[in-house]
């Protein structure tokens, strides 16, 4: 067989090696490759900067490791300072490379696909970005990028002005740019977009960055643009401005849109979203009352695969006070034949909407989440009954008020869930507070494919463990019920699990009956068994401790 006899490997092979190291996120080896030879430097540095946003220096993800590592304070402080300096060197090299082709060894900014100005802002505002580190960052050719200001009688960096200046310089050279993230001032983004023909995604802190022609710039220059995330947009005219931006875009541009936090978008924006018939994922958080009253304006979005709607207040009664709107929303959701993942949070009429939509033969969900409803309610009963019509469901997440329920309320809920034999994930948070062990047993016997089971409840004995042991795919079991398990019963349950299929198993008893407390030695013994035999974890909290915790954060 012929073999390659040259002194160095072909460039194609070197590039493939670097690509594989990049896929493995092995930045240490890539850096060594860059230092090893001139022929290796180009593909190694290209890969390093293409993926720089995943590097430890960029994410500063080893920061806690330095603090926890054994050693004296001076050594750890020096290691931490060196690690932080790598972060500043990364951003300095990116910025310098945008000035002239010969300022840096390679034109690093030309390799970049993602510009995350959130990360740059975090670095500039970090308490370690002072003194010699700040001076070194802005030294030489970067002096024009230093915008100092006085804040509380001390000199700091004007982060907004600095980010704008660096962004203006870098985007002039980032010809491969696919994503722009960060808090960007109004007026800058259209120019940056026009320089980025490969742009696909933007993640912006405030929607105001989109004004003054960002939509037109995308329409004229960015054929691949499709994803937009906004953190907030509280301007009084946000609805009009966002609708104008969406109208500036070519029809069917967006496939993904997410509004994360507080905003004032509403009817006009919803109607403009309907122009984008390829929109597959729509997530609208913290909707105001006017927006909820105009949800029917979203009826043009019929290709939705994932829909998440969050009512900021939870007080709007559209079924009672705006029934025409309510019926239009039901009709819209029922017509979305591609809808697979549906989430409603704090909607007063959430159960009423779902009780009708779930009956639609056009809707075949795989994931469903409802948060912020009351179980003791006629519409809740209708919703729980309607669950049985969605046998394609693989994940159900329910959270609400489970107090003062009747036996019928709980029985209807359990019966509806027991029909979902394809379920892999079931989370019942607070809605199941008055579950008995019979309810938990019924679910365990009816849902053989469960992998993740989270439920609250009243007092439950070890009688629930044998049925739970029949769940051969279960990987996570979290019980916020008042469990009454002896250590030998817990061990018997754990020993019945399959060490291969249930590897990584986690058992969390988060509200154990104080009369069934386990000593620290017993807990350690159980933890060691589950670690050694299942590579898993055991959590144990007594009820009196759980009572003081906020399960809403779990």
Which ranges hold each PLM region?
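Leucine-rich solenoid repeat modules
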Residues: 2-5, 12-20, 271, 281, ...
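Short alpha-helix boundary/capping motifs
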Residues: 30, 34, 160, 208, ...
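Short secondary-structure transition/capping segments
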Residues: 60-65, 320, 464-465, 488-490
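N-terminal adaptor/linker regions at the entrance to substrate-recognition repeat cores
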Residues: 2-318, 337-341, 537, 554
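Short, structured segments at the rim of ligand-binding sites
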Residues: 319-325, 478
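Structural motif corresponding to alpha-helix initiation and N-cap regions
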Residues: 98-102, 164, 186-187, 211-212, ...
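Short secondary-structure boundary micro-motifs
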Residues: 152-154, 326, 426
């Amino acid at each position: 067989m012929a073999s390659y006899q040259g002194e160095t490997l072909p460039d194609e092979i070197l590039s493939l090696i670097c690509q594989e190291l990049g896929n493995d996120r092995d930045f240490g080896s890539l850096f060594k490759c860059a230092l090893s030879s001139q022929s290796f430097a180009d593909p190694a540095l290209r890969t390093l900067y293409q993926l720089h946003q995943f590097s430890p220096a960029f994410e500063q993800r080893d920061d806690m490791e330095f603090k926890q590592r054994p050693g004296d304070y001076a050594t750890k402080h020096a290691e931490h300072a060196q690690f932080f300096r790598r972060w500043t060197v990364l951003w300095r090299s990116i910025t310098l490379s945008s000035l002239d082709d010969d300022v840096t060894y390679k034109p690093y900014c030309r390799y970049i696909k993602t510009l995350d100005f959130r990360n740059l802002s975090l670095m500039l505002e970090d308490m370690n970005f002072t003194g010699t580190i700040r001076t070194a960052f802005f030294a030489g050719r970067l002096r024009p990028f230093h915008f100092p200001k006085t804040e509380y009688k001390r000199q700091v960096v004007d982060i907004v002005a600095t980010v704008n200046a660096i962004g203006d310089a870098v985007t002039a050279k980032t010809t491969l740019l696919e994503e722009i993230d960060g808090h960007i001032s109004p007026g800058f983004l259209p120019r940056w977009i026009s320089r980025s023909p490969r742009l696909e995604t933007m993640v912006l802190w405030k929607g105001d960055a989109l004004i003054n022609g960002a939509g037109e710039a995308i329409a004229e220059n960015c054929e691949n643009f499709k994803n937009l995330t906004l953190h907030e947009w509280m301007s009084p005219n946000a609805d009009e401005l966002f609708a104008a931006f969406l109208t500036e875009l070519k029809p069917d541009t967006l496939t993904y849109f997410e509004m994360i936090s507080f905003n004032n978008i509403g009817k006009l924006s919803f109607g403009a979203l309907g122009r984008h018939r390829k929109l597959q994922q729509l997530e609208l958080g913290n909707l105001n009352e006017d927006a909820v009253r105009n949800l029917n304006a979203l009826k043009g979005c019929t290709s939705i695969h994932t829909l998440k709607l969050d009512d900021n207040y939870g007080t709007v009664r559209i079924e009672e006070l705006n029934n025409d709107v309510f019926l239009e929303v039901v009709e819209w959701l029922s017509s979305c034949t591609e809808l697979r993942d549906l989430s409603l949070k704090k909607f007063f009429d959430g159960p009423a909407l779902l009780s009708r939509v779930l009956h639609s033969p056009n809707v075949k969900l795989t994931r469903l989440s409802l948060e912020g409803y009351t179980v003791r309610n006629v519409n809740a009963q209708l919703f729980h009954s309607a669950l049985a019509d969605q046998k394609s469901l693989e994940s159900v997440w329910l959270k609400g008020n489970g107090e003062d329920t009747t036996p019928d309320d709980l029985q209807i809920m359990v019966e509806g869930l027991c029909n979902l034999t394809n379920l892999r994930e079931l989370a019942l948070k607070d809605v199941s507070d008055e579950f008995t062990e019979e309810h938990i047993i019924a679910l365990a016997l009816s849902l053989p494919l469960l992998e993740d089971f989270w439920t609250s409840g009243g007092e439950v004995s070890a009688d629930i463990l044998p049925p739970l042991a029949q769940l051969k795919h279960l990987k996570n079991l979290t019980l916020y019920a008042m469990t009454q398990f002896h250590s030998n019963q817990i061990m018997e349950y754990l020993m019945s699990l399959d060490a291969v299929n249930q590897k990584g198993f986690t058992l969390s008893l988060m509200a154990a009956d104080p009369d069934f407390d386990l000593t620290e030695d017993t807990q350690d013994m159980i933890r060691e068994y589950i670690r050694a035999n299942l590579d898993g974890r055991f959590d144990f909290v007594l009820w009196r401790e759980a009572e003081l915790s906020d399960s809403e954060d779990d």
